[in-house]
């Protein structure tokens, strides 16, 4: 018989690095979840932009079960068919010629930064080690990636941090230009800053970074962990901007809920990563790559990408209507189905409170800092689910505006 558990057990048994919601989801289908008490929620959080096809998608369940009935894991001393097939699909769909599989976005970014440093050291010299990143970015929680992230809140307790990482202002080409020089080995940037407030880059900014990297022989890394796999209405956001990076990192939606990450690059850059220079025990395991292959088959279609753009318009229209009613947001921004509602000054710092009230009303949303409510729903969310979820979100806004919301 299974052990009966409650939310209170989290506080008793788990390392307290999270403060989970007061309810425990136990079942999901599409864009709906149900908790232990049977309450239904519309899911606009998507596991933080992970559940690109919603919960328990039948094609993903079939792919997982089919591979689970064969074998689960062999380690990196062997390759496997699902990993090779997924690598070829990613290569055919993008600029890439080589793929490295891992288990998360942080691992993918770690691999990208290590590759950039090694390439510069091998081809130029050890002095070419500088990394330019951006303030309020998020690239993961390893010591290297959290240092690149440019949010002291996440890194200040773990000094000394890796050296030679400097941070420019996002969407400010002059700020970046002042830091990028011949000793720079890489520039890492999110096409849309997700955790930093759902801020899309301007095309001129990314084009300018491309030109600066070319001028100084630095590698341009696009962190597409949150924007990738259809989230923005293109398979990857670099396609939306028409700016091609040297390295692209992807994770989250790639597995549709099954942990996987990948670093994509060209043959020339990949060639410096010789046997033993990097690795991972679980990366590219057949369960993850079988599921991810099916995710890519479904999402990498004109129908799906057109659908994301249409759903973007539906969200924006309804959010604008809601904002006319409540006047809570100073800006509604984002690309595709990665959207952020910036709170007016009078509601500053209350994004988490709105998210808590939304959950009480039966809709799950995210935050991106204290002042931005973030939406990252499934790419196949239905019109009815959008309408129902935003009606529930309106109840949370109404409660907050009336002053009846409280933390907890």
From Swiss-Prot:
Pfam families: Aminotran_3 (PF00202)
Entry superkingdom: Bacteria
Cofactor: pyridoxal 5'-phosphate
Modified residue annotations for N6-(pyridoxal phosphate)lysine: 252
One biological process term in Gene Ontology: alpha-amino acid biosynthetic process
CDD domains: OAT_like
Keywords tagged on the record: Aminotransferase, Arginine metabolism, Pyridoxal phosphate, Transferase
EC number: 2.6.1.81
Catalytic activity: N(2)-succinyl-L-ornithine + 2-oxoglutarate = N-succinyl-L-glutamate 5-semialdehyde + L-glutamate
Pathways per UniProt: Amino-acid degradation; L-arginine degradation via AST pathway; L-glutamate and succinate from L-arginine: step 3/5
Key word Transferase present: yes
Molecular function terms, GO-annotated: identical protein binding; pyridoxal phosphate binding; succinylornithine transaminase activity
Record function comment: Catalyzes the transamination of N(2)-succinylornithine and alpha-ketoglutarate into N(2)-succinylglutamate semialdehyde and glutamate. Can also act as an acetylornithine aminotransferase.
Alphabetized HAMAP family for the sequence: ArgD_aminotrans_3 (MF_01107), AstC_aminotrans_3 (MF_01173)
PANTHER family: AMINOTRANSFERASE CLASS III, SUCCINYLORNITHINE TRANSAMINASE
Family: Belongs to the class-III pyridoxal-phosphate-dependent aminotransferase family. AstC subfamily.
Record's protein name: Succinylornithine transaminase
Source organism of this protein record: Salmonella agona (strain SL483)
């Amino acid at each position: 018989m299974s052990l009966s558990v409650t939310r209170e057990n989290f506080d008793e048994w788990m390392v307290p690095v999270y403060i989970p919601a007061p309810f425990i989801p136990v079942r999901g289908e599409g864009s709906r979840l149900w908790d232990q008490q049977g309450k239904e929620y519309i899911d606009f959080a998507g596991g933080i932009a992970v559940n690109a096809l919603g919960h328990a998608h039948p094609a993903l369940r079939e792919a997982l079960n089919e591979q689970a009935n064969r074998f689960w894991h062999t380690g990196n001393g062997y390759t496997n068919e699902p990993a090779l097939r997924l690598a070829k699909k990613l290569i055919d769909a993008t600029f890439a010629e080589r793929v490295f599989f891992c288990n998360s976005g942080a691992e993918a970014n770690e691999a990208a930064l290590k590759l950039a440093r090694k390439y510069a050291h091998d081809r130029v010299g050890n002095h070419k080690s500088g990394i330019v990143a951006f303030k309020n970015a998020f690239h993961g929680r390893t010591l290297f990636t959290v240092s690149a992230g440019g949010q002291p809140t996440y890194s200040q307790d773990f000094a000394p941090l890796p050296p030679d990482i400097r941070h420019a202002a996002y969407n400010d080409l002059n700020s970046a230009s002042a830091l990028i020089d011949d000793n720079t080995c890489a520039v890492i940037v999110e096409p849309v800053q997700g955790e930093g407030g759902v801020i899309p880059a301007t095309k001129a900014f990314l084009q300018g970074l491309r030109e600066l990297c070319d001028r100084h022989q630095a590698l341009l890394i696009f962190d597409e962990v949150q924007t990738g796999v259809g989230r923005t209405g293109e398979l990857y956001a670099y396609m939306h901007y028409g700016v091609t990076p040297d390295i692209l990192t992807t994770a989250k939606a790639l597995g549709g809920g099954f942990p996987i990450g990948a670093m994509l690059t060209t043959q020339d850059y990949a060639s410096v990563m010789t046997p033993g220079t990097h690795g991972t025990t679980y990366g590219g395991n057949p369960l993850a790559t079988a599921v991810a292959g099916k995710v890519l088959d479904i999402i990498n279609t004109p129908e799906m990408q057109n659908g994301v753009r249409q759903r973007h318009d539906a969200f924006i229209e309804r959010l604008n209507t809601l904002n006319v009613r409540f006047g809570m947001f100073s800006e509604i921004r984002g690309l595709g189905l990665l959207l952020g509602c910036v709170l007016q000054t009078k509601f500053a710092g209350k994004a988490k409170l709105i998210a808590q009230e939304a959950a009480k009303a039966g809709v799950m949303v995210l935050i991106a800092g204290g002042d931005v409510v973030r939406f990252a729903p499934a790419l196949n969310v239905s019109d009815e689910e959008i309408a129902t979820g935003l009606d529930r979100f309106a109840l949370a806004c109404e409660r907050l505006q009336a002053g009846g919301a409280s933390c907890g």
